[in-house]
Amino acid sequence: MQQLGERLLKGKTGAIVAINPANGEILCIATNTPSGSDVRQAIGKPQAPGSTFKTAQALTLLSEGVITPETKVSCVNGVTDGNIKVGCHKHRSPLALKDALAQSCNTWFLMTFASMINDDFMYETKDEAITTWRSYMQSMGLGGPMHIDIEGEQGGLLAGADYLNRRYKNRWDGKTIWWAGMGQGDVTCTPLQLCNLAVTIANRGWYYVPHIHQDTKNQRYLTRRHTKVHQDAYAPVIEAMHLAVEKGTAASIRTTYPICGKTGTIENPGADHSAFIGFAPMKNPKIAIAVYVEHGGFGADLAAPMAGLVIEQYLKGKLTTASEAKAKRISAQKIRESPR
């Protein structure tokens, strides 16, 4: 699996991280850069997570009661507020949570996130709202180093009250930071953290600190960490992630076994970055994965099919003839810099 990951990343800059959800063991940590393999690409280079982050947003919003699985938001190619325009691809409208996540509707996640931050009935201040939001994200292993047993780890960014008040001089609200609702702006994560996010969803609310050494006796890596997310929030999100692979933005995986996943397309100067998080099988998951390819385009273009191949290799022990041909095609693609 490690060799396959390295082969898929040939000629590209990015990382593939896979973790066993049952015990936190790192199964694969393949990386590539213009100067060769560098583990910091997976654990020490936080970047915007893009729409993969919508899974964590949905779990938080459900847990706080800001939304229900039936909450619908209308979207016509995006949303405009004053001189701010955020685009979205064409899809039917309005959408409830399951389809909003499967189709990766930007409008849905921007508007629901803003409604949480601006809710002065549920929260006395916007500082309280953003602090509450941040605490959920931190409980899922985001926003700080996880203290894995590999040197070079960095924690990433999760906008908090102090940071926002300092950056925007106390003049901010939900729409000032609403890009965080779709994993852009004031939020960054490493591929390791994104893989661990997939672990927490696969396990419906808990994880072990990821570690590379399987024979560790250190209690740091043997103690379950529980998220703040309400237990009943996981089912609709997992169903939506399964729908994303079956009929949504991650359908390019095309597997015969049930994978749950979420693509991410990260806006970037030049060509977008391609990302994917997921786990398989849907029941009793054996592997969680995150793939991040710089300048790889849409999440469905590279990250999702790469993840599907690595998952197949792990669960089946080998690739089918068709999958091997796909792996060769991906390996032959060279993407070092933005083609724009």
List each model region and its residues.
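Short, charged, low-complexity patches
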Residues: L194, G299-I311
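Beta-lactamase-like hydrolase cores
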Residues: M1-N20
